[in-house]
Design a protein with these regions (language model features):
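Domain-level signal for soluble alpha/beta catalytic cores
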Residues: 1-397
Length: 397
């Protein structure tokens, strides 16, 4: 059989879309004109995915606004405009500390206190290092000051309608489309001045996000739950916790997500695990084997995860010892967002076969490690997707 292909969601924004996002934020572009331009852009990005040969496609997350070509956080910050109960202040987001843990339990440190960033502080502070992220401009960052509510219906319906319109234009069924949405655990990593503790925030986020997930799946599209907090969150705890305590912390987030997904067909859900999108050493990442069973507890039949970058490419072997639950399938990353080197199609094919030879061709969908938009130069990102499609064809022979 032919092994199917997809990607994790975020694709490079065009200069026209970035400028339109800026104009809309400044109030010089009205909603009707913006929606028309956005639809044209979504039609174009879906068409390009189809022309490359990708099977399961999306809107490039074009509805998750970016006003700069380089943006590692649009997958998260898009949610700020879809939650009621937030107040905003211009701050350096890396210094914000998420909600405190319940009864002295684990909680996240600030982004700036990440163990990876602390260990390699000289590199992160050096503009010539290639991983410099310091001195970013302040952004309007949210604090929870009231009961969280969902105010994103119009925005998510635009995402849904745009994706379905573009799928129809290229002759693809709705079942070949997906829309990305944030997990409760990731959405909860904002400042809190209302709820009792971090767990209360996570459960409140789950109640809010249920509406977004349900609208996407009710439309026949697959929802991809972006949950880097499950893996990447380990590094944001300083000092390093025990694996046992971290698993208990993460289990709360899994349970809250399953609450949000209650009643939704798992066939229409895929769960994305990653160790963060920043281009750094990642020596403090948690091993996939320590959390993979938690990821498999999610009521999602698809599991997407990093498997191509240099820190995690070796972990494909864990699947030799895991019995994949009935109905579930793997969506491994076989090209990476962490390097500008475009993977050779034969290497891509080898990586695909590593998984397919263990679980079967029909239970593998080849993908990217993470989103490419805002992280990889556009022409390189598209070349990586071409290599992905070519590699899948080779692996299917």
């Amino acid at each position: 059989m032919t092994i199917r292909t997809t990607h994790v969601g975020s694709l490079p924004r065009t200069p026209e879309l970035i400028e339109a996002n800026r104009a809309r934020r400044e109030g010089s572009l009205g909603d009707a004109d913006f929606t028309s331009l956005l639809q044209d852009q979504v039609d174009g990005v879906v068409k390009r995915q189809a022309e490359i040969g990708l099977d399961i496609v999306n809107d490039g997350e074009y509805g998750h606004a970016m006003i700069d070509a380089v943006d590692y956080g649009a997958w998260w910050t898009y949610s700020f405009s879809r939650f009621g109960g937030l107040s905003f202040e211009d701050v350096q987001r890396f210094d914000v500390r998420p909600p405190a843990g319940r009864d002295g339990r684990l909680s996240f440190s600030s982004f700036a206190e990440r163990r990876d960033w602390q260990r390699f502080a000289d590199a992160y502070a050096d503009p010539d290092s290639g991983i410099h992220i310091a001195n970013r401009n302040p952004i309007a960052f949210p604090t929870i000051t009231g009961e969280l509510t969902y105010i994103g219906a119009e925005a998510v319906e635009r995402d849904i309608a745009g994706t379905k319109h573009a799928l129809e234009a290229v002759g693809k069924p709705v079942s070949d489309g997906f829309v990305a949405a944030i997990s409760p655990g990731s959405a909860a990593r904002v400042a809190n001045a209302f709820y009792e503790d971090d767990e209360a925030v996570v459960w409140a986020c789950a109640d809010v996000l249920r509406e977004e997930y349900k609208r996407i799946t009710d439309a026949g599209l697959t929802v991809q739950i972006d949950a880097p907090d499950i893996a990447e969150g380990w590094d944001q705890m300083n000092p390093e916790p025990s694996v046992e305590d971290y698993r208990a912390f993460s289990r709360v987030r899994i349970d809250a997500l399953n609450h949000a997904l209650e009643g939704i067909d798992p066939d229409l859900v895929r769960f994305h695990v990653c160790w963060g999108s920043w281009h750094g050493p990642h020596t403090t990442d948690i091993a996939f084997k320590d959390i993979v069973d938690l990821a498999l507890l999610v009521n999602a039949n698809g599991l997407t995860f990093e498997a191509a970058n240099a820190r995690h490419a070796h972990e494909w072997t864990i699947w030799r010892d895991i019995e994949l639950p009935e109905g579930k399938y793997l969506i491994p990353g076989v090209v990476s967002h962490s390097t500008n080197v475009v993977e050779h199609p034969e290497l891509v094919a080898q990586r695909i076969r590593q998984f397919a030879d263990i679980v079967g061709d029909e239970r593998v969908v080849a993908s990217t490690d993470c989103g490419l938009g805002g992280r990889i130069y556009p022409s390189i990102a598209w070349a990586k997707l071409e290599a992905l499609a070519q590699g899948a064809r080779l692996a299917s022979k």
